[in-house]
Amino acid sequence: MTREPSFIVTIDDERHELFALADGVITLDAIRAHLDEERAAGALAYRELIDARGATPALSPADLRELIALLRGDALFARHGPTAIVVGTEDAFATMRTLALVLADVITLRVFRDFAEAVDWLAAMPAPTPGPLRPPTWH
C-alpha cells in the first residue's frame, strides 16, 4: 500500500521563510500542487526548508523533464528563494541532487541528509527579494 503524498506547509511572512514537511510517495502532481500553494501565498521567493525524510520521490525521467521546464518557466517571471531539501535515502539524494545541478542557473537548491546542516545553510543565505523580476517584453 502506497502512502498518499502530502506537503504540510508553514509560512512565516515576517521572516520570509517557508517550511514544508513532505510525506508519502511524492509525484509530479504533488510537487505541482505544492508550487501552486507557494505561488498563491506569494511565497516563491521565500527561503524554503523541505523536510522530505519521510517521503519517497516517484518521478520518472519524463516527470523530471516536466518539473525542470516548470521551474525554469517560473524563473522567467519570479524569483525562487533558496531551497534546502532534506532527504532520507540515497536514491532520493541522487534524484534531488541531479535536479539541483540542472537548475543551478535559476534556483539555489541544495540537498542534505542532515537536518541541522540544512537549517544552518539556509540561515546563511541572503535575505530574499520577493516579487517579479520584471514584466516580460514581447517583440
Locate each region found by the language model.
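Amphipathic, Lys/Arg-enriched alpha-helical "gate/interface" segment within cytosolic domains
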Residues: 1-139
